Amino acid sequence: TPEPEPDAKPNGTSGSIVQIQDENGISDYILNENPDLIINVVDATNLERNLYLTTLLKELGKPIIVALNLYDEFKKLDYKLNKKDFVELLGLEIVETSARTREGLDILLEKAINYKNKQDLNYKHHLNSFIDSEIEKIENEIISNGSFEKAIKDYSSYYLAVKLIENDSHLIRILEEKYGISDFSFIKKHQDILAKEYDEEPEIILSEARHGNVKGIVKKVLTTSFKNR
C-alpha cells in the first residue's frame, strides 16, 4: 500500500497538492499551471526507478525540493546514502521524510517556504558531451530568437530545447497558442545530427541518456545491505 504524500501546509501559505506519476502528468499540470515550487516525493527504497521523473522535473528549471519518502523503511533495509555526493550529483535540495511517522515534514515545509520563487537555481544538466553540445546550441538559438522572448520567461531555455528535440506535441501547442510561435524548423538540423550519431529517434536517445545518468548517480551514492541485494 503506497504511503500518503506529505500534505501539511504552513500557516500563511496556500496551494494545491497534485500527485504526478509520470511524464504525462508534467505536461498536463505543470506546463499549464507554471508553479513557483515543486516538491518531488520520491520512494527512497527504490531510487533508480523514481529519479527518472526527478530528472524530467529538473529540466523545467523550477525550484524543486526532493522529499525522500519512506526513509524509515530505507533505514530498516540498512541502506546507506552518501547524502553529500547525492545532493552534488543531483543538484537539488533533498529532505528525508516519512509520511507515516511524519518524520522530516517540518524541515520540508521550512525549506519549501525559503525555496519558493528562488531565482538563482543555476541547474547543471548532463546527459553526455555530444548530446549536451547539441542542446546548448539549440538553447543559444532559442535565446537569440525574438519569437521566444516571452516563452523563456516562463520556461527554461534548456527545457524548451529538450522538448523541441523530442517533438513534444503538448509543448509545441502551448508555444503556438500562448506565445504565437510558429517556426520550429531550426530544430530539424539538430535532430538529424543526433539521429545520425545514434541511429535512433531523438526522443529515445534522450530517454536512454537520462536513464543512464540516473543509474550512474545511484551507483555512486547508494549502498544496499548484502542481505537485501
Protein language model annotation of sequence segments:
Residues 1-3, 33-35, 194-195:
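Gly-rich Lys/Arg/Thr-decorated short loops/hinges at beta-loop-alpha junctions or inter-strand turns
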Residues 21-95:
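Conserved C-terminal guanine-recognition region of P-loop GTPase G domains, centered on the G4
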Residues 4-7, 47-49, 73-77, 102-107, ...:
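Switch/connector loops and helix/strand junctions flanking conserved nucleotide-binding motifs
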